[in-house]
Amino acid sequence: DEKFSITHVGLMNSDRNPTILWEVLNEISNTNLNFKNDLRIKLIGKLDDAVIQDLKVFDHNTIETIPYLDHKDVGKYQASSQILLLSINEVPSAKGIITGKIFEYLQAKRPILAIGPEDGDAAMILKNTNAGTIVGFKNKTALKATILNLYKDYKDYKEGVLFVKSVNIEQYHRKNITSQLAEVIKKVVS
């Protein structure tokens, strides 16, 4: 994407609605016209009514919603997006949540911006792979700084695409995970 695109793929229900992100993006947009003009939020998948309501603060041309996209086409959106948004459910068990989405995002090799527990399992994966940043559910200051740093990188990198120097992502490829699961099942059965 030529724009500063932030893309989320999949269901975004009420406990996965990153209200803090919408607030921060709106604050930055209201004080930085270049950011406002560059920002694109792409949401692919079913959205809770609360999410739709929260997004009304943005200009119509800032938001792109696609209710359904065939899985084979999702990869194109992920690979072309500047940033992939991973929003962990804000629930008591959030530290242990690892969505399947994180593994698909890793394969896209785009920067991941996650909102969730900074000491959770998803945070550990992002740290081990150098594939992105996780910001706590209520850490508005860190989220704003992260977005502004990503935006600065986007503006500085004139070829138009942000990239990550991820490492060790092969261990999270679905073939490897399936193989590891098969080994566990074999051990349990025998």
Where are these regions (language model features)?
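Conserved donor-binding/catalytic core segment of Leloir-type glycosyltransferases
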Residues: D1-R16, W22-L25, I177
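Short hydrophobic signal-anchor/transmembrane segments that target glycosyltransferases
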Residues: T19-F35
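Nucleotide-activated donor-binding/catalytic signature segment of Leloir-type glycosyltransferases, i.e.
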Residues: N32-G45, D49-G75
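Acidic donor-binding loop of glycosyltransferase active sites
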Residues: H60-E64, Q78-K95
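Short alpha-helical segment that forms part of, or immediately flanks, the ligand-binding pocket
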Residues: G75, G100-A108, A123-M124
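Short hydrophobic beta-strand element within catalytic cores of glycosyltransferases
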Residues: I83-S87, E104-G116
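A charged, aromatic-enriched C-terminal amphipathic alpha-helix characteristic of glycosyltransferases
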Residues: K138-A142, K155, E159-K187
